[in-house]
Amino acid sequence: MSQPFAKYHGLGNDFILLETDASPLPHHLVRALCDRHLGIGADGILLVSPHPEADARMIVHNADGSRPEMCGNGLRCVAFHVAARLHRTPTSVALAIATDAGIKRCLVEIDPPSPEAHVRIDLGPTTPPVTKTIPIPQAALDLLTTSVGNPHAVLFHPPVDLPFHEVAPLLATHPSFPLGTNVSFATPTQDGFAVRVWERGVGPTLACGTAACAVAAAAIHAGHAAFDRPQTLHLPGGPLTVTITSDGNAILEGPARHVFDGTLAAF
């Protein structure tokens, strides 16, 4: 049976979007579709279906088949997809999207037929950051850990000689994090932080919305930033804006882009 799909990305963090109730998908199918040589290629798959208490439901699969609790870039893409399906003229669309981390409120600025939208999301509360010292062969590193619906660990001021591609996966799978964690290296810039992300179940990505929120929350805890003030997080794929409100909610703003549509020959 054939299955239509759409390809989206948020600052290069790319997804295959399927409107289907079939969930969860088998791991082997997710890995095959996300394979960049033998499949469509993506960091993950977004499943969109109806929900009785929201405009849609989003379920996320990472490229390895695992299922994260939340995905900020994926949520922006789903919100854009749903808004564009409902509206064909320039407008601001308020939506509620159900996720494994609860129902999230989104505001989508669309301008058809532009393939890009600006999306603002209230991701809800972050947990108060906690310092964990993690020993690895290279060093003992002090990380700030928090949750934005999914787990994150943030290292500020990483030493320049600390190899990200070696150290980040060690931290992401360290026994101190029984469920694994997303890892961010954050370096101060003139207007925010430069952030590199190792996503649990994916690896290095060009952008991660919840990681940007985790860095913003950790920055306030560390005294680098303040509540209720927008922070700019510079990821390899581009900037995201995050505001942590005085009550701890993370407000994420950034683009979502529709790349192309297609049909899976067999599903």
Annotate each PLM feature.
Residues 1-115, 154-267:
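A glycine-rich beta-to-alpha transition motif near the start of alpha/beta enzyme domains, typified by
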Residues 114-124:
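Short, solvent-exposed secondary-structure boundary/capping segments
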Residues 120-122, 142-145, 196, 253:
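Active-site-proximal beta-strand elements of phosphoester/diester hydrolases
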Residues 125-126, 239:
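Short, charged beta-turn/beta-strand-edge "cap" motif at the junction between a beta-strand
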Residues 127-131, 259-261:
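Short, charged/polar, Gly/Pro-enriched secondary-structure boundary elements
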Residues 130-132, 139-141, 170-172:
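Glycine-rich, charged/polar anion/phosphate-binding loops
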Residues 134-161:
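Internal active-site segments that recognize and position negatively charged phosphoryl groups
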